[in-house]
Curated annotation (Swiss-Prot):
The keyword Cell cycle does not apply. This is Hemoglobin subunit alpha-D. InterPro entries: Globin (IPR000971), Globin-like_sf (IPR009050), Globin/Proto (IPR012292), Hemoglobin_a-typ (IPR002338), Hemoglobin_oxygen_transport (IPR050056). Belongs to the globin family. CDD domains: Hb-alpha-like (cd08927). One of its GO terms (molecular function) is metal ion binding. One of its GO terms (biological process) is hydrogen peroxide catabolic process. Involved in oxygen transport from the lung to the various peripheral tissues. SUPFAM superfamilies: Globin-like. Residues 1-141 form the Globin domain. PROSITE patterns: GLOBIN (PS01033). One of its GO terms (cellular component) is hemoglobin complex. It comes from Drymarchon melanurus erebennus (Texas indigo snake).
């Protein structure tokens, strides 16, 4: 459960990013495909070259979904419901990939925020990303 302090830290860190969450999503997706190559199976129709237009576009979708969830912290489930349906019923993404992407998002955030990505901020993002992953996985049950 996100505390008031977690929410404050999330909002503050987004304000300090110096880029859009869409850029963070694109960077994290690039990292995911390099570090966890098994995730490439879901993107066989994409140009998987690092920084390709396909990867950037898909990563921007990740960032937009996170941005939307951050704007609706009291209703992450409702906000991401359609995305959860898409991943569970249509794309059939292995749920472990949400955790792997979360790890890559942490690295991307830390890279952009540097010293601002301290233990408290990291914990707030970890709680948030765990909630997002839980929502995206719940339709698999």
């Amino acid at each position: 459960v996100l505390t008031a302090e977690d929410r404050r830290l999330l909002q503050a860190s987004v304000g300090k990013l110096g880029c859009r969450l869409e850029d963070i999503g694109a960077d994290a997706l690039n990292r995911l495909l390099i570090v966890f190559p098994q995730s490439k199976t879901y993107f066989s129709h994409f140009n998987l070259s690092p920084g390709s237009k396909d990867i950037v576009h898909q990563g921007e979708k990740v960032g937009k979904a996170l941005d939307s969830a951050l704007k609706h912290l009291d209703d992450i489930r409702g906000t991401l419901s359609q995305l959860s349906d898409l991943h569970a019923y249509n794309l059939r993404v292995d749920p472990v990939n949400f955790q792997l992407l979360s790890k890559c998002l942490h690295v991307s955030l830390a890279t952009h925020l540097r010293n601002e990505y301290n233990a408290s901020t990291c914990l707030a993002w970890d709680k948030f990303l765990e909630q997002v992953a839980d929502v995206l996985c719940e339709k698999y049950r």
